[in-house]
UniProtKB/Swiss-Prot annotation:
Pfam families: Methyltransf_25
Localization per Swiss-Prot or TrEMBL: Cytoplasm
UniProt EC number: 2.1.1.144
HAMAP family: Tran_acon_Me_trans
Function: Catalyzes the S-adenosylmethionine monomethyl esterification of trans-aconitate.
Cellular component annotations (GO), alphabetically ordered: cytoplasm
Family listed: Belongs to the methyltransferase superfamily. Tam family.
Enzyme class per UniProt: transferase
Protein name (record): Trans-aconitate 2-methyltransferase
Major localization listed first in the record, in broad terms: cytoplasm
Keywords: Cytoplasm, Methyltransferase, S-adenosyl-L-methionine, Transferase
CDD domains hit by this protein: AdoMet_MTases
Domain of life: Bacteria
Length: 252
């Protein structure tokens, strides 16, 4: 599991794209020229940007070769670059930096967010959506299984929090719109929950395990999910998925 799996990621494409659509709807920009899609993945968020601003120059950034290859195949008219978000430098100031479900993987948000604001043009916008599910059973159980089986903690850090992000971006010279939404995804089985998180949140936990260790981990994880997520009357499971949204507009 050394690289991301675009096919597995896109298995829940509609659910993963919905937050991007809702984030994009709150971006207060009309005619713009330069856009960066940070953590573009297979290009599903980039396609939304291209639909809204077809004349803009859009660059998708991702560290995964597999994701970049998939995005290039899907959107040949857009530019895609394999790079680390923290080190990538645009050739010109950006009117919009769009980051849908990517920045949560990176550390040091107190430094990262002001850095991203510095890449914006005057009145440019930083639009961010991050899963805020560190305390949800899906992610708590990952840590518990790893502890039970004596594996090191490889999960991401929790988000800084609403008040912290507001202060970080206000001090960086932005007007800030911030909100949190909890989605309730209808899942047909506990295995479907595993399929969902295997493409994202479970990757760090599984990537260095042998095949037998992965199976042992997932078997125990499945058992614990059954205890935490009861079936609805119709047999479905409601998977709560909180997400944090930020639209920060540079005032300088």
């Amino acid at each position: 599991m050394s690289d991301w799996n675009p096919s597995l990621y896109l298995h829940f494409a509609a659910e993963r794209s919905r937050p991007a659509v809702e984030l994009l709807a709150r971006v207060p920009l009309e005619n713009i020229e330069y856009i960066a899609d940070l953590g573009c993945g297979p290009g599903n968020s980039t396609a939304l940007l291209d639909q809204r601003w077809p004349a803009a120059r859009i660059t998708g950034i991702d560290s995964s070769p597999a994701m970049i290859a998939e995005a290039r195949s899907a959107l040949p008219d857009c530019l895609f670059v394999e790079a680390d978000i923290r080190n990538w430098q645009p050739e010109q100031a950006l009117d919009l930096i769009f980051a849908n479900a990517s920045l949560q993987w990176l550390p040091d948000h107190y430094e990262l967010f002001p850095h991203l604001v510095s890449l914006l043009s005057p009145l440019g916008v930083l639009a961010v959506q991050m899963p805020d599910n560190w305390l949800e059973p899906t992610h708590v159980l990952m840590r518990e299984v790893a502890w039970e089986q004596n594996y090191p903690d490889r999960g991401r850090e929790p988000l800084a929090g609403v008040h912290a992000y507001y202060d970080i971006l206000s001090e960086a010279g932005c007007e800030v719109d911030i909100w949190r939404t909890t989605y309730y995804h209808q899942m047909p089985s506990h295995q479907a929950i595993i399929d969902w998180v295997t493409a994202t949140g479970l990757r760090p936990w599984l990537q260095d395990l042998t095949e037998s260790e992965q199976q042992h981990f997932l078997t125990r994880y499945h058992q614990m999910l059954e205890e935490q997520y009861p079936l609805q009357e119709n047999g479905q499971i409601l998977l709560a998925f909180p997400r944090l949204f930020i639209v920060a507009r540079r005032t300088e």
